[in-house]
Structures are given as structure tokens and as C-alpha cells.
């Protein structure tokens, strides 16, 4: 454990202060468009630097409205106490050590949700909470629950709904994988499946995907640990742009923000000397 902690700390201390700043015009447009909704769902492909950074920028803009803000992250709910402790801390070396000691961060199967970029997002939210009414909610089920996809989506939505009901005056900004954030009434593979976003329909969600046209992401392609690594995104002809619609699109969201490029973010507990293939 001591060796693991030293590796974690070395990585944590090499995090950039703000490795990516989302374009302010796009962030402003998203916040303005979502202003009439209680929940802003952000769907991602896990494991990039840029999307968690964009979520931090969105949180900063939304918090400026001076309404209580709930930021939901697809982290195991068993980590909630450690997150609360970190949010109340000064963000020191020791504080990061304590946070990164959790099983979510140290697990072998690193799927991009426990990346250095996610740690940086939490640190930016911690700093923002010093001057704003903001709290972070870890809404994913712990793995011991062993739920199927539909049950997990429902459980995640219920966790977020409870947080919203506890603070009727609050709005929520939620980051999750871009299947969970779909608000459509069914799944392409199962007309009975309900995504997390659809379960939150009573809370007037606005759903937006943020993804990269080019670059790389830390992803897993199977259940095996060695399937998780940095991968280049496939070539495509998509144009980088922000589209904010009024209706649910073919991808199950209201809008999409295609960033020109994204870059893979390694696990927060990876050795700082780790290189990408």
C-alpha cells in the first residue's frame, strides 16, 4: 500500500493546473441554452483530458448564477465520504493521497472514469465550492450490486433524483458515459430499456454529448484489464462544432459539441513515467 500511495501521489502532484480551457463562447451558449432546465446531462466517451475540463468550466459558469449546484459524477457511491472529505479540504498532497486510496481509484480495471483528468475536475470543483454553494454526488452503483445495464441506469437516476429532491432549489450538472445520458424512451437494442437520462425526465433534463473529432481516449474494449489503454479515435469526416437542438436527436441527446481534438488521460494512479502506445 505504501508503494501504491507513493505512485498515486507522484502522479497527482504532476497534474497541470488547468490543462484545457473550453472555448468560452461555447460554454456560455450551453449554459444559456440549458438555463430553462433543472438538469444538464453531459455524455462523454470516458478517458479524455478535455471533457472533464469542459465540465469544470460549465460548473464555474452555472455556479455564477448563485443557485445551489449539484455536480453528479459517475463514480461509485461508496466513494462519497472520501469525496466529501476532499471537497472540505485544502487540496494538499495528503488530501489527494487520502482520496486516491479508495478502491475506485486503485482498481485494476481502469475504464477512464478514474483518470488524472477526473482528479483534476474534482480539484477544480473543490476550489469552486470555496465560493459557491456546490456539492459533488457520486451516483454510480458499487460493483458489489452486480446490476444489469437497465437496473444500473435506474439506480443511478434514483440517486440523482434523491439529491435533487433534497435541494429543491438546486440545479444539477451531470457527467456520465454517453449512453447513460440519453433521454430517449428506449435503446436501439431493447425497446424496453430506459437510460438514466430518461428516468430523470421529470427533472427537465437537457442532454448534451461532448466528444472529440480526432485525438485519443483511454478506453476499455472488453472485460479484461489489459483491454484498457489509450487509443486513437477512428478517422471520420465530422466537423468540429456545437449544435444545441430543441428536440431529441438520433443519438438520443438534444445537442452535441464536437471538439476538434481530445487527448487520452491516464489513470490518476498511473506512474508519471507511463507512456501511451
Language-model segments: what does each one mean?
Residues 6-18:
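Bacterial N-terminal signal peptides
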Residues 19-277:
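Compositional signal for N-terminal targeting/processing segments
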Amino acid at each position: 500500500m505504501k508503494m501504491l500511495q507513493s505512485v498515486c501521489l507522484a502522479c497527482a502532484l504532476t497534474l497541470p493546473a488547468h490543462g484545457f480551457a473550453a472555448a468560452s463562447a461555447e460554454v456560455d451558449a450551453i449554459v444559456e441554452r440549458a438555463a430553462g432546465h433543472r438538469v444538464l446531462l453531459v455524455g462523454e466517451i470516458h478517458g479524455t483530458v478535455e471533457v472533464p475540463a469542459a465540465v469544470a468550466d460549465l460548473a464555474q459558469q452555472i455556479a455564477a448564477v448563485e443557485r445551489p449546484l449539484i455536480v453528479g459524477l459517475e463514480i461509485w457511491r461508496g466513494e462519497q465520504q472520501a469525496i466529501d472529505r476532499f471537497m472540505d479540504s485544502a487540496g494538499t498532497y495528503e488530501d489527494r493521497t487520502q482520496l486516491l486510496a479508495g478502491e475506485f481509484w486503485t482498481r485494476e480495471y481502469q475504464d477512464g472514469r478514474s483518470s488524472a483528468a477526473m482528479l483534476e475536475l474534482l480539484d477544480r470543483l473543490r476550489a469552486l465550492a470555496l465560493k459557491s454553494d456546490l456539492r459533488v454526488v457520486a451516483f454510480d452503483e458499487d460493483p458489489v450490486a452486480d446490476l444489469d445495464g437497465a437496473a444500473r441506469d435506474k439506480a443511478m437516476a434514483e440517486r440523482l433524483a434523491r439529491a435533487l429532491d433534497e435541494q429543491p432549489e438546486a440545479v444539477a450538472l451531470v457527467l456520465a458515459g454517453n449512453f447513460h445520458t440519453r433521454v430517449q424512451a428506449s435503446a436501439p437494442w431493447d425497446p424496453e430499456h430506459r437510460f438514466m437520462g430518461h428516468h430523470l425526465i421529470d427533472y427537465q433534463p437537457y442532454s448534451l454529448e461532448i466528444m472529440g473529432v480526432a485525438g485519443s481516449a483511454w478506453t476499455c474494449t472488453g472485460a479484461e484489464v489489459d483491454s484498457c489503454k489509450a487509443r486513437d479515435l477512428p478517422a471520420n469526416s465530422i466537423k468540429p462544432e456545437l449544435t444545441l437542438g430543441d428536440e431529441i436527436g438520433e443519438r438520443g441527446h438534444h445537442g452535441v459539441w464536437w471538439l476538434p481534438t481530445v487527448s487520452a488521460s491516464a489513470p490518476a494512479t498511473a506512474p508519471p513515467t507511463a507512456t501511451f502506445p
